[in-house]
């Protein structure tokens, strides 16, 4: 070792040092939980062998108590705010809540075994909201597999670690349901790639390598080639209409990401062709009739939208934006309405409203085709020179009068399309040439 150190508390499990505490006095103004974090980093440098078997770290000044891993930055150390999974009394995180919530014997063993994983080089400890929600989801899925197949809806707001919660869930499912086959469904290729990438980074934790289905035929081959195990990723669009059942097995669990968008179960008559068109949700359920379905979403489901609840069952757990911001899991978002006066006639306004209605519904193929025919007209309106000029003048005015000397950081202007983004960029530089080093255009991979 590099020197002699004496940590405040070390928790041993069968003789192995699995948790290290660093405590600071709440009565001393010069020390706090941040000082405890720096002390822990110092220990890792000076006495590294102590951390070979380390599961996680705890830093506390009694007023603030947080847990994290050896790879986590200070901002990723999180409070453990409940002993039983309730969100009712989580405004303040008490030291005894962390101790009783994490260090009850069975729970500590459960956390070490099932709720710590490596994602690439990062060692990740589940937050309290992830731990209790995933445990609830497992119980809900086991019950659904023996009844109606409706595992429920898992709503954790965007940015709070929903993708990792899905990884923890998939890991636990293997033992809880005797190695079922898991089919993960998204409604966009880019989301499929993102979620697949997250799972692929955790193959050691999952004890298997996820695969992506390239087509309905490929999906059938992947399902037919096994009687258990497997994590298969696919998009809803690959479930093209067919009367063929892909698999009648009961030990299949379907995880639908952003479940509210593409999992409606319905059939409609196309007024143009007279054909009955089935929703993706209906096709999927006819293709996997005996599977158990669980929906994951980061977006509030409208009180008017009963379809998602009817398809998946009741909420398993709700971790909303308010709770996530209070916990520091996500940043707060504030909305301020801005009105740009444009000269649009009533027909144009009606057309825009209709298109937003289409986009707000599930992305069925026939709805997309109808929408495409009108989008060109909307782009010509939103991309008109007078529209862009009015928008950019308002942005410049708002920045210089209200934000320039008040905030640091970055701002994002999200455009309707790539050509419109370029017009906004050029117009901003025409108005403020000195912003040349401050303004850039960033293109997304898909549009």
Where do the language-model regions lie?
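Conserved motor-coupling elements within RecA-like helicase/translocase cores
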Residues: 214-232, 245-249, 447
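Conserved helicase ATPase motor motifs in RecA-like P-loop NTPase domains
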Residues: 158, 260, 281-304
